[in-house]
C-alpha cells in the first residue's frame, strides 16, 4: 500500500519535512532540458542584441553547431523504404461498375498495409474502408460514410499511417504532428483531364472533379507533395521535417504511392534563423482563367480554360516558343501561328489543339491590327490544308483605296506555301522534250550568243562585293566571307513574294540560295553578263529607261508583237535549262573553270526545297527565282523562243539571229518583237512544242506598246511612257514596307511614283498629294523596288499625250480624267482618298478575303452601298474610270497592256462599252444622282453585248467599313 505523505502545514518549518530525493532517471531527462532552455535563452538574448545592433547575427557555421546539439533524427527510411516494391494487382469482381479504379485502389491499400507490417510498424488506416482489418479511424463526412461504423483507435508509438485515396479530405499537418511514417495512395495528375473506361477527371479552379462509372462524382483539392522535403510545426512549435519519396504506378499514370518519412525534429526556437518554408500547401493549378499543370522534369505542360473539360498537352519549350512568337509579332497573332509551331513540334492533333491553345495564351488577347487607314481587305488567304490558319500579313494600307476592287496581298503561311507549290511549281512543271530540230536550234543559238568558246574568266569575289553594294547584299556577303569555298553546299528555301495581285491568285515564290552559292556563282554570272549579254541589243536588263524607249522606237516602226507568258518560271523544262542556259555558260568559260560552274549549276537545281512555313516540295527544273541566273537565264530562254520562231519562218540561222538582234527587246519573260507576217502563229507553235504557254498581241505602227508594266502610247513620235493605270491604281495604297511608320511608308511609295510618273494623271497626283499630307517627309528606309524607281526616272515629255492615252485606257474623256485627277489632288487626308477606278475582281483561286470565301465563278451584278463622308453628305465625283457611257466606235483604241478586260486583237478598244439601250435607261434615272455640281455620277456599267455578265468574274468586294471621301453612286443597270 502506497504510503501517504501529508503536506506540511503552513505553520510547520520546512526543515522538519523529510527530504525528497529525485530519481536518477528524472535527473538524466532534466539535464538536457535545462541545457536546451539555457541555450534557448541565450539565442533569444542574442536576437535582442542583434535587433539593437550590439552584435552580429550568427553565421551559418555557428547556427548549424547550435542546431546539431538539439536535433533529433529518425532512421525510418532504412526499414520502410526497402519494402516499397512493385505494386501487384489483385483481382476484383468481374461485374464491378468501375473495376479498373477499384483494382488499383484495393491493390494499393493491401500493398501499403503489408509494407508497414513488413517494416515492423502497426498500420493505422485513416478513414478506413469496410475491408480494412487493421487499426484506424472512421469519421462521417458524406452520406456514404454512414454505412460503416464509427471508429477511432488510439495512436501508439509504433504506428505507421496509411492513407488510401483519402488524404485530400484529411488535415495532413495535424496527422504529421504525430511524427510517424506515412504511406499515401493519392492522385497526382499529369494532365488537367483524363478519360478511361470507368472513370474520368478534370481540373478547374484548383479542384479535381472526379467521375466514376456506376459511382458518384467527387470534387476536392489536392495536397502539393512537390519537392524532396515537407516541414510542419509540432504541437510545441518544434520543426518536424519529412522527406518525400514518390513511386509511380505502372498502368495508372495519374496515381502515385507517396512515402512521407519523419526525418528530423528541431525544437523551437533553434531553427528560427533558418530559411524554412513551413506548412503543407494545396496544389495550385489555376492562374486567372487558365488551368495550368507543369511537370519540369519531362517539360510537359497541360492547359485548359476555366470551366472546360478539354485540355491541350504540349511541352514547356513549345509553349515558350508560341508565347514568344505572339509577343514579337508585328501583325495580329493568328491561330495558324500556333498550329504551325505545334505541327513542327510533332503534335499530331495540332489542328484541334491550336484553336484551344490560342485562346489560352494571354498575349494573344491584347494584340490588335495596327492598320488604321482603312477597313478594306488588303490580304487574301488561300484555302488549304490548315483549316484554321489565318496567316501572317506581308504589308498594309497607307491610304484608302482608289479602286472599287483594290489589289490584294497574299498572307504568308502554310496554306499560301501549299498554293505556291501547287500553282507555281507542280502545276506548270514542264517535262516536254521537243523535236530534234529544236536541239539544232539550241546549238545554233548558243553558238551565236557565245561566238568564241572558252574565253571567259569569272570575276573574283572582291569585284562581286563592289557591285553588290546594297545593305542586304553586303550583309549576306559578310556573313559567309570567312567560310566560303568552291565546295560550299546549297539549300533551297522558298518564301512568298510580297507583291499585290489584281485578284486572288497562286502567290509567287522566291527561292533563295545559300549565301555561299550566291556569292561564288555570281562571279560567273557577272562575267557572262558583262562580256556576252550586255553586247546583245535584245537584252533589256541594265538598259536605262531612255535606252529602253529608243530600242522600242526602232522595233515599233512597222508594228509590234507582244508576248505574255503564263507561269514562265515554273514552266521551264530540264531540256531548256541544260540545252540553252547551261550550254551558253559552259561554252563561254575556260575548260578548267567549267567544272566549278557545272557544280554550282547542279546545286542551284537541287530537287528538294523547303518553304518558310516548313512545307517540303520537289522543286523540279523551273527557274529558281532567287538564284544568280534568274533574270539572265529567263531572258536567254525568251530570246531562244524568238530565235526558234524566225527559224520556223524558214529564215537561215544567220538571218534568224540578225532579226532577233534587230527586232526584239526582252527582259525576263517580257518581250516586244518587230512584227512580220506569220510571226504570231510561229510563236504559238514554238511555245507549244517547248511546253510553254503564252498569249500574243499584235499592235499596229501607231498603237500603244506595253513593256514591263509601262505603256508607250505613241513610239512613232516620242518615248514618253507611263505606268499601266489598270494595274497600278488598285495597288497604290498598299505597301510591303514594315520597317518604317505608315506615314514614312506612304511617303517612300509616293516619292518612287513621283520619279517615274510625275506627269501621269491620278498616279502622279496621288504621289504629290501623299507627300504633301505626310509633311514632305524625305525618303527613308525605302524598299528595293522604291529605290529602283527613284534611280530610274522615265521621260514624260508630252503630258497631253499621256492624258489622252490614259483616258482611252480607262474608257473616259480627258475632261473626266482631269476631274478625277482633281478629286485626288483635293484629298484631305491619307484615309480620305477618293475612289476613281471602277474595276472588278477575276479571282483565280479560292481564298478568304475580308472574312468571305471567294473564288472563280460567274459574275453577279450588285449595287454597292454609298460610302458617306463624316459630314453625312455624299460627294459625287466625276464619272469613275472604267464606267464610261460615252465611248463610241470612232474612239481611238486604248493602248496595249496586260490588265483585265484588254482585247487580244489590235485596233479594238479594250474597255467594253455600254449598249445604247442601257445608256438610255441610265439617262432616265436622274433621281439616283444626288447633288452633282454639274458632274456626272459614277455608275456601274454593264459589259458589251446586251448587258449579260462576264463569265469567270466576281463582283467587287464591298466593305461597309471602308473610310473614303467620296460616295459611289450607282444607277440601276
From Swiss-Prot:
Q: What are the Low complexity biased-composition ranges?
A: 924-935, 955-973
Residue stretches making up the RdRp catalytic domain: 558-683
Renumbered to this chain, region (Disordered) spans: 853-973
Q: What is its EC number?
A: 2.7.7.48
Q: Spans of biased composition, class Basic and acidic residues?
A: 882-891
Record-given protein name: RNA-directed RNA polymerase
| Reactions mediated catalytically | RNA(n) + a ribonucleoside 5'-triphosphate = RNA(n+1) + diphosphate
Ranges where the record places region Capping: 96-264
Q: Name one GO cellular component term.
A: host cell mitochondrial outer membrane
